[in-house]
Amino acid sequence: NVLVPPCSGCYSQSGNTCYYDVYKCPS
C-alpha cells in the first residue's frame, strides 16, 4: 500500500487523500 504523507497546515485528510480545509484556514 502507498502511504499518504501527513496532512498539515491548512490540509485535512479524507480517506487516502489530503484536501484544503477552509475551516482550518478561513479567508
Curated annotation (Swiss-Prot):
Modified residues (Hydroxyproline): 6
Keyword hit for Disulfide bond: yes
Swiss-Prot/TrEMBL keywords: Disulfide bond, Hydroxylation
Top-level taxonomic group: Eukaryota
Cystine residue pairs: 7-18, 10-25
Coiled-coil stretches: none
Function, in words: Has analgesic and anti-inflammatory activity in vivo. At a dose of 0.1 and 1 mg/kg, exhibits anti-inflammatory activity by reducing the volume of edema during 24 h better than the nonsteroidal anti-inflammatory drug, Diclofenac, at dose of 1 mg/kg in a mouse model of acute local lambda-carrageenan-induced inflammation. At a dose of 1 mg/kg, reduces the content of tumor necrosis factor-alpha (TNF-alpha). Demonstrates a significant analgesic effect on acute pain sensitivity in the carrageenan-induced thermal hyperalgesia model at doses of 0.1 and 1 mg/kg.
Family classification: Belongs to the sea anemone BBH family.
Protein name: AnmTX Sco 9a-1
Organism: Stomphia coccinea
Source taxonomy: Eukaryota, Metazoa, Cnidaria, Anthozoa, Hexacorallia
